[in-house]
Amino acid sequence: MRKTKIVCTLGPACSDKQTLTEMCKAGMNVARLNFSHNTHADHEKRIALIKEVREELGLPIAIMLDTKGPEYRIKTFKNGKITLKENDVFTFTADDIEGDETRVSVNYKGLPHDLEKGDIILLNNGLLSFEVTDKTDTDIICRVKIGGELSDRKSMSFPNKTLKQKYLSEQDKQDIKFGAEHDVDFIACSFVSCKQDLLDIKAYLKEIGAEGIDLIAKIENRSGVDNIEEISNECDGIMVARGDMGVEIPFEELPAIQKKIITKCRMLGKRVITATEMLESMIYNARPTRAEISDVANAVYDGTSAIMLSGETAAGKYPVQAVRTMARIAENTEKNIHYEKRFLSSEFKIKNTVDAISHATCGMAIDIDAKAITVCSLSGMTARMVSRFRPPVDIVGLTTSEKTWHKLSLSWGVTPQMCENYPSTDVLFYNAQKLTKHVLKLRDGDKIVITGGVTNGKSGNTNLIKVERV
């Protein structure tokens, strides 16, 4: 059973029920909606469709809303595009003008106040580069370092620079409210630079009565990397968003950053998603490149909770095949990882009772050669903490909450399973044995380790470990 989860971006390529159904069967665990594109009406149709499909299949499939985040773009040119050469002088202005070969407007009026001489501006995903040589209250005068064709509304990036624009825009607020109204499970927060960005979103979620949505912080710039500790402590998970990160940070640093973030999240018990260009060639081709296969495998070796498909499923020619391919790579890679050795050699910080019991549960499962760990968890917290230790046995996450059932689909190694309320520990143990045996197809006499709380219906009461034979 595959331990690493798969996040798939929905789009035109998978807007029909048959394709989405096949993607779920192929291994999709989380459906991602990118709110940088499409209308609320488009997203509403896709949310309704994924809910319909997951109900028919009886599968826990979480829904993730990915925000647009702070956006910096140029506006338009008189003729739609221009061509710039190295050492040309070019101006970005806060004034509203029609762009030409010498200047263009920007969408952020405060940009001239945030930049200094010597700062670098990248456009069109880093294909064009500019160095700031001077500025006024409204203009940023630059020297073209790398030229090329520049067309309307291209994105702007500022390596190693944190701008002062307000993090939570009105557009993001509208999108988040829409997501809350349509019962999304996760919000992926774009361009998180510090913990205050997350606190702003939490405050807004509280304002609209949607505090049950989990936050995934997307790390896409230098500030996000530098502040990973405080960001990790404020969110429910991290996305290593390598696309924009590779523009804002020298690309040769990305592999080390990816590994450090994944390790940090594992130590803290946070879910971590590795994203961007994992099987990019499958947008057009039925088979991935050898480098892409190794990229996916390396993320799995690192211990990522999930791997993500973007354009491959949203707009590619082979969305189902892309999911199937990613699942095959992950499954085969996991067979070659010695999880028991990793667990025994890792140094985890045990901070509370849940940590201690979760760690002991994993150790006991190894010691007695158990076939599974069964976690009874209302909120999913205990299941996530057990998952954090990456045990070598399967984890079954039993919950009475449908919301938790879907959310656990993003947790490494956890097979979510709905169960009824249990009036006593005896009934709890009976249900745990019965459901675990059924879900994992265990044999009579196989041992499982059960952990959870004695108090029924309350979160945070994890206080037991028990060994049972099915």
What function would you assign to each model-found segment?
Residues 1-470:
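Non-catalytic helical/linker scaffolds that mediate oligomerization, partner binding
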